[in-house]
Amino acid sequence: MVDESNAGPVAPAVVADAEVKAPTGKKRSSSRPQKAPPEPAQPKMPAAKRRGYSEQERSEKLRLIETKVSEGNTLKDAIKSAGISEQTYYHWKGAAKSAAREDIERTRPLSAGDEFAELVQLEEENQRLRKQLAEKLRTENTELRKRLGLD
């Protein structure tokens, strides 16, 4: 029979398994080429300088766009011919609309005050005319009584 107490050949098998099961780190391939360092990006075209338009120029461009649209051009073409972007057009249009509302609101209290003053004046004139009418009716009544001999 074989002697089982001899563990000589079994030990290397366990050691071999231990080496196989040992965690191995991620191996890097040295054959992959290195990336070139990034070059500084150069702008293709210089950015367009932002241009500020005065209120008068804005309103003129908005009127120009409105006339072109009324002539039959598309809104997009009219905006392009005015030399502004669609976003700018809508921004200016909204600002013009809100400015018009503010103007109306500012003039309302003035016109309301004028209307109130006119109303007061009309009421005074109405009172004066009523007094004149009452006086005229009294004088006519007294004359009629004298003619009829009722006094």
Swiss-Prot record:
Q: Offer an example of a GO molecular function term for this protein.
A: transposase activity
Query: Which residues lie in Basic and acidic residues bias regions?
Result: 52-65
An example GO BP is: DNA transposition
Q: What keywords are assigned to this protein? A: Nodulation, Plasmid, Repressor, Transcription, Transcription regulation
Q: Which gene encodes it?
A: syrB3
Listed InterPro entries: Homeodomain-like_sf (IPR009057), Transposase_8 (IPR002514)
A Pfam family assignment: HTH_Tnp_1
| Region (Disordered) location | 1-65
User: Does the record carry Aminoacyl-tRNA synthetase as a key word?
Assistant: no
Q: Which organism is it from?
A: Rhizobium meliloti (strain 1021)
Q: Which family does it belong to?
A: Belongs to the SyrB family.
What broad taxonomic lineage does this protein's source fall under? Bacteria, Pseudomonadati, Pseudomonadota, Alphaproteobacteria, Hyphomicrobiales
| Low complexity composition bias: residue spans | 7-23
In Swiss-Prot or TrEMBL terms, this protein is called Probable transcriptional regulator syrB3
